[in-house]
């Protein structure tokens, strides 16, 4: 057991009191004590359709037998193009290009690179500053940690984080939002902090703003009404 170093886990305590899952089916895990445990996190949001769905298993098996892997350098499989097209058709009209990555961390770091690269090729090389949000989680890559706002994830790596990052305040205020149904009505004014940050640094230096629609890892914080689409 000591060979595996678990992430985001106090390993010394875990080895004394291990939680071992042996199987999963539908919305449940089954541990080594025979207990049936409801998976309230959907496999850390990676299994939203449940575990061990035979239809998904059959599709994976069929694809593996046809083509298990095709490098994306100078070539691609027909299935990859078909999947990209399906994703683009389901996305908002302005999001019509797909770039595949292996994880959320890789996706965030890639998105930051795309933002900076885009501005550079457009002749705006000064646009390198990123804006994230307090308490945000954007993965474990250095870019994601930099734009993220979780202190415990950042404090040991300050010298390695990308420069030029600022953070918006988070939207949680229990005194105003407790027991709200749906999106809270209070808090839209917090979006105005973005204008202050842009004015502070000059709009010509901003490369991108990155926000989680719902801040998951810090408590499933639902944004307030009009936060991401403030009225003019």
Predicted features along the sequence, with ranges:
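PLP-dependent aspartate aminotransferase-fold enzymes
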Residues: 85-207
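Conserved small/polar residues in nucleotide/adenosyl-binding loops
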Residues: 227-232
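Short, acidic, Ser/Thr-enriched surface-loop or helix-capping motifs
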Residues: 31-32
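Conserved PLP phosphate-binding loop immediately N-terminal to the Schiff-base lysine helix
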Residues: 210-223
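Short beta-strands and strand-loop turn motifs
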Residues: 38-41, 169, 208-213
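Active-site-adjacent loop/helix segments that line or gate small-molecule/cofactor pockets in enzymes
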Residues: 1-28, 42, 75, 190
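Glycine-rich loop-to-alpha-helix module at the N-terminal edge of alpha/beta enzyme cores
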Residues: 7, 36-125
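Residue-level signal for well-ordered, solvent-exposed loop/turn and beta-edge residues enriched
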Residues: 35-36, 220
């Amino acid at each position: 057991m000591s060979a595996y170093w678990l992430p985001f886990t106090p390993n010394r305590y875990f080895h004394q009191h291990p939680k071992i899952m042996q199987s999963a089916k539908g919305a449940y895990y089954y541990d080594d004590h025979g207990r049936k445990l409801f998976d309230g996190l959907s496999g850390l949001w990676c299994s939203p359709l449940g575990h061990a769905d035979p239809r998904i298993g059959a599709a994976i098996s069929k694809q593996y037998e046809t083509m298990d892997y095709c490098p994306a350098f100078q070539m691609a499989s027909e299935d990859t193009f078909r999947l990209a097209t399906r994703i683009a058709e389901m996305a908002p009209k302005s999001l019509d290009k797909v770039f595949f990555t292996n994880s959320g961390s890789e996706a965030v770091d890639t998105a930051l690179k795309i933002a900076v690269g885009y501005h550079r090729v457009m002749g705006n090389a000064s646009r390198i500053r990123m804006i994230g949000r307090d308490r945000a989680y954007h993965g474990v890559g250095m870019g994601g940690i930099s734009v993220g706002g979780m202190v415990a994830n950042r404090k040991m790596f300050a010298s390695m984080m990308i420069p030029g990052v600022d953070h918006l305040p988070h939207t949680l205020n229990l005194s105003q939002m407790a027991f709200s149904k749906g999106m809270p009505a209070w808090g839209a004014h917090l979006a105005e902090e973005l204008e202050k940050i842009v004015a502070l640094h000059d709009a010509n230096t901003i490369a991108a703003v990155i926000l989680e629609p719902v801040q998951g890892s810090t408590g499933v914080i639902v944004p307030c009404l009009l936060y991401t689409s403030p009225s003019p």
